[in-house]
Amino acid sequence: YSLYDVELLIDEGVSVVTVCWNNSNRFATSAVDAASGEDRGLSPLGRELVRILNDRKIIIDCSHASDATFFDILDISDKPPVLSHSGVRHFRNIPRNASDEVLSAIESTGSIIGINLCPSFLSRRARKHITVQTVVEQILYLSERFSPDILALGSDLEGIRYLPSDMKGVEDIPLIFERLSGKMSEEAVSGVAFDNFFRFFTSVRE
């Protein structure tokens, strides 16, 4: 994509732009590529992309970006980047998951992380041992270690092949919130379900 292509997509109604996918591109270094080579972060063209996205009030998604890319964007962007569908390295140490440093930055800037339901992001254990309870435990950990305000659900249902073993599809997502009930306040559960993302979305788009 060129910057012109990005502008065309925005004109068509796109409101969230991820700077790269699993492979690095002209704009940014990806998390996967950074793990096997040099993490160059954001390119000069990527910095221009951030300027355009800021001008157009577009949410910048760093779910697939390297740590250096995330912090480069954080340094120059009017609004913090979001992790729309990621995991947590504390539980599964893979490049696509968020480090404590990234999570601390998300907390301090009022951004959010959407917890990905991909079993291989949640744990190294066999899928049969990865359940709704696994997701709940990670949400509770993040709520206590950082803040419940950073939390959302970033299921990635259209991008993953498998779900936790006791989930069949989107119809089972309410199980997560049922398990959270009583362990978090009603306000905090509503935040994970909708309110936190909506708050962040409107803060960037307004």
Kindly give the residue locations of the regions a language model identified:
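Extended, charged catalytic domains and RNA/DNA-binding interfaces, predominantly
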Residues: 1-116, 120-122, 136-143, 150, ...
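Conserved residues at the C-terminal ends of beta-strands
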Residues: 20, 154, 195
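Soluble non-cytosolic domains of exported or imported proteins
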Residues: 44, 129, 133, 167-171
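Active-site micro-motifs of SAM-dependent methyltransferase domains
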Residues: 88, 159, 199
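Short acidic/histidine-rich active-site segments
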Residues: 117, 146-170
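C-terminal helix-coil-helix/basic helical segment that borders enzyme active sites and/or dimer interfaces
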Residues: 124-126
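Outer-membrane beta-barrel pore domains
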Residues: 128-129, 160-167, 180-184
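Mid-to-C-terminal alpha-helical segments outside catalytic/metal-binding sites
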Residues: 168-206
